UniProtKB/Swiss-Prot annotation:
This is Alkyl hydroperoxide reductase AhpD. It catalyses: N(6)-[(R)-dihydrolipoyl]-L-lysyl-[lipoyl-carrier protein] + a hydroperoxide = N(6)-[(R)-lipoyl]-L-lysyl-[lipoyl-carrier protein] + an alcohol + H2O. The keyword DNA-binding does not apply. The keyword Cell wall biogenesis/degradation does not apply. One of its GO terms (biological process) is cell redox homeostasis. GO terms for molecular function: alkyl hydroperoxide reductase activity; disulfide oxidoreductase activity; hydroperoxide reductase activity; peroxiredoxin activity. Homotrimer. The lineage of its organism: Bacteria, Bacillati, Actinomycetota, Actinomycetes, Mycobacteriales. It comes from Mycolicibacterium paratuberculosis (strain ATCC BAA-968 / K-10) (Mycobacterium paratuberculosis).
Length: 178
């Protein structure tokens, strides 16, 4: 199970995604933990079994157990937070004075370097489409001294994984329908 398997699973019309997937795994903008944590959190955020299985297997060989669990924790807590804060954002500030009241202890104590966890939350928030969360995590990353290039590379990784998941679903769905 691997990124290579995902590349092979992509249909011909997703050749750009295949090339981008190969390129992102060779990035020099992200260190190994940042890259594989971003890929794993993003794969979990896509809710695509094949993508998560393939990325998860390769990430398990690369990440420490703490980083592996933190990346999945980022995807999980952002699944909740992105819905809450995106939904609240639709309400024109009418609920901004109310406390969220949601437990999110992992954000304060992720078990890995805080900036890496924030990077994974940022990537997942982009996939989940929460502008408030994307902006908040980007701000936290910049305050921590993370470069714009590193942040953009994580965004690219999230976009690629999201596109791969969509292409695989489309291909599999049409193959079983036809």
């Amino acid at each position: 199970m691997s990124v290579e398997n995902l590349k092979e699973a992509l249909p011909e019309y997703a050749k750009d995604l295949k090339l981008n997937l190969g390129s992102i795994t060779r990035t020099t903008e992200l260190n190994e933990e940042q890259l594989w944590g971003t890929l794993l959190a993003s794969a979990a955020a896509t809710r695509n079994t094949q993508v998560l299985t393939e990325i998860g297997a390769e990430a398990a060989d690369t990440l420490s157990a703490e980083a592996y669990h933190a990346a999945l924790g980022a995807a999980s807590v952002m699944a909740m937070n992105n819905v809450f804060y995106r939904g609240r954002g639709f309400l024109d500030g009418k609920y901004d004075d109310l406390r969220a009241g949601l437990r999110m202890n992992i954000i304060g104590n992720p078990g890995v370097e805080k900036a890496n966890f924030e990077l994974w939350c940022f990537a997942v928030s982009a996939i989940n489409g929460c502008p408030d969360c994307v902006a908040s995590h980007e701000h936290t990353l910049r305050e921590a001294g993370v470069s714009r290039e590193t942040i953009q590379e994580a965004l690219k990784a999230a976009a690629i994984i999201s596109g791969v998941a969509q292409a695989i679903v489309a291909s599999q769905t049409l193959a079983t329908a036809g």
